[in-house]
Amino acid sequence: MVKNYWLMKTVSVILNGYKRNHTLREQVEAIENQTHKVDTIMYWQNTSQLRYDLSPLVDGGHDIAVSTKNYGVWARFAYALNAKTDYVCVIDDDTIPGDRWIENCVNTYETHPGLLGTIGLIFENDTYGVLGENRFGWDNNNTEVKKVDIVGHNWFFHRDLLSVFWRELPSVDESFLVGEDIHFSHMIQKYTDRGTWVPP
């Protein structure tokens, strides 16, 4: 019973579309074939000049929201508030998860709660410089869970952490096109005792 505890954890995946219409079908297939089954796939699309074939989402009965404006990278975290699962996984449109990614995240979260991602950075100094050896994840594999300053491309977290993400709102003068990765990790560091991690 304890061995299969992770199987009871529910997960929503948030996909987004903006610049890479060629990856959507492969992403949906990868998520539908996870070893830990995903409960809901939710798709957010900012306005785009590219034409998107949404049939993989329609055929699978997945949730779709298409905006007539570009609300940037932060909008998908607002859309994630609609998730009704234990965990949420937000995936960039340039990322195809391996078939055990969700299983790996659920298992890792049991011992390393917080924010998990596919690429993690450790900053060298106050100017946020990063050397190649301080990048971890798919392009610099780590064999153990690695604590990092920020993660990107894929964010896996308990749904409750959405309230931490939105605890401080960015200024209306700030761009919503970047910065969600630093903001999320900063909010977790500032308001919780959890960390930012890259699973092995």
PLM segments and residue spans:
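N-proximal low-complexity "stem/linker" segments adjacent to membrane-targeting elements
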Residues: 1-30
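Short, acidic, metal-binding catalytic loop of nucleotide-sugar glycosyltransferases
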Residues: 29-38
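Short beta-strand/loop segment that forms part of the nucleotide-sugar
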Residues: 38-49, 65-66
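Active-site-proximal specificity loops/subdomain of glycosyltransferases
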Residues: 50-83
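Short aromatic/hydrophobic "clamp" motif used to bind/position activated sugar donors
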Residues: 88
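The conserved acidic donor/metal-binding loop of glycosyltransferases
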Residues: 92-96
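Conserved catalytic core of nucleotide-sugar-dependent glycosyltransferases
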Residues: 98-170
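Acidic donor-binding loop at a coil-to-helix junction in glycosyltransferase catalytic cores
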Residues: 177-183
